[in-house]
Amino acid sequence: MSSKIVREPATKAVADGTYHIKNGGYYLAVNPDRQIIIQQTVYAWTVFVDGEYNYFKDPKTTHYLTDNGGQNVLSPKADVDGRWGNASVDIPTQLINAETERSLGVPYGTPSDTWILVQV
C-alpha cells in the first residue's frame, strides 16, 4: 500500500492589503506623470482581490494598473484591463492580465519578467 504526499501549492495568493510589487531590488512604481516605472525606492500599492484576480491601485491617485493596448498605464478600476492573475507573496511570478493575457511589462526602467508581492 502506497501513500501519496500531499503538498501545498507552490505560491500563496495575496489578500486585500498594501503591498510592494518587487523584483530583486526594484519596485513597481508610478512617477509624477502617472507613468508606470521601476525604481529602487520602495513604492506601495493597494491590492484588492476579486475572485481569482487582483486589482492594483496606486494610492497616490484614484487609478489602477491596467494593460491598455499592450501598454501598462493607470486607468479607472472600471476598465476591464485592470484585472491581474498569478500574484504571489512567496514565489516571484509573471503577473498576467486577465483580459489581454499579456504579462506585465514596464516601459520606463529595468524590465522584469517576474514579480513578488511583499505586504507592508
UniProtKB/Swiss-Prot annotation:
Unripe and ripe fruit bodies but not in mycelium or ectomycorrhizal roots. It is found in: Secreted, Cell wall. The keyword Ribonucleoprotein does not apply. The keyword Secreted applies. One of its GO terms (cellular component) is extracellular region. Its main location: secreted. Residues 1-12 form a propeptide. Keywords: Cell wall, Secreted. May play a role in the structure of the hypha-forming fruit bodies. This is 11.9 kDa wall protein. The gene is TBF-1.
